[in-house]
């Protein structure tokens, strides 16, 4: 007869302890068993995951996904993906949709541990990527060692404040940026962004 604990261990999602994501503690990532199984299927059932694990440099790209901001993020992904022995990927590449909202945080948790570099394209403090940065701030000091932020700055001071004045998020992200000061690269134009990404090893 199989040991139940051994069976459970084989069913765990690599990189995430089941107790950590099922317990309904305020600071944990809560998933139902069904959600946990879907997350495992989306990530480990993807051909992309095999490609990622075989690459020497693995870039997880996060940031806004709408309109021009999303296009710039895709461009960054293409630039990093074109490097030798490298692959660049986003959560969306694993088939996560708006219906999987509860899976985005734990998926980011797992994939950021898998990545050799976590690269954020930051143009404002609005959107799901702010939550992802908060997760890095609170829970993953080891992942912070791999974090790079490509942060857009604006010539107009009022616009700068409008884009980055977001109360608690601003203070938390400012602390995160300070902790990785030499890996925060600023840019203003798309040409600047192409130059900025060259600083990411």
Tell where the protein language model's regions lie, with residue ranges.
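Conserved catalytic or regulatory cores that recognize and/or transform ribose-phosphate-containing ligands
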Residues: 1-201
């Amino acid at each position: 007869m199989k040991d139940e604990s051994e069976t459970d261990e084989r069913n765990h999602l690599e990189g995430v302890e089941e107790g950590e994501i099922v317990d309904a503690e305020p600071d944990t990532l809560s998933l139902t068993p069904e959600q946990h199984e879907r997350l495992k299927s989306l990530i480990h059932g993807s051909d992309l995951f095999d490609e990622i694990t075989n690459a020497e440099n693995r870039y997880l790209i996060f940031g806004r996904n709408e309109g021009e901001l999303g296009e710039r993020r895709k461009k960054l992904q293409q630039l990093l993906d074109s490097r030798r022995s490298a692959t660049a990927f986003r959560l969306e590449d694993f088939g996560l949709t708006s219906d999987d909202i509860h899976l985005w945080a734990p998926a980011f948790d797992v994939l950021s541990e898998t990545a050799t570099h976590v690269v954020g394209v930051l143009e404002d403090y609005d959107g799901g990527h702010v939550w992802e940065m908060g997760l890095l701030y609170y829970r993953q000091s080891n992942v912070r060692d791999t974090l790079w932020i490509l942060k857009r700055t604006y010539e107009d001071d009022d616009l700068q404040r409008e884009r980055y004045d977001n109360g608690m998020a601003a203070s938390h992200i400012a602390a995160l940026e300070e902790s990785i000061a030499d890996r925060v690269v600023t840019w203003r134009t798309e040409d600047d962004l192409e130059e900025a990404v060259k600083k990411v090893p």
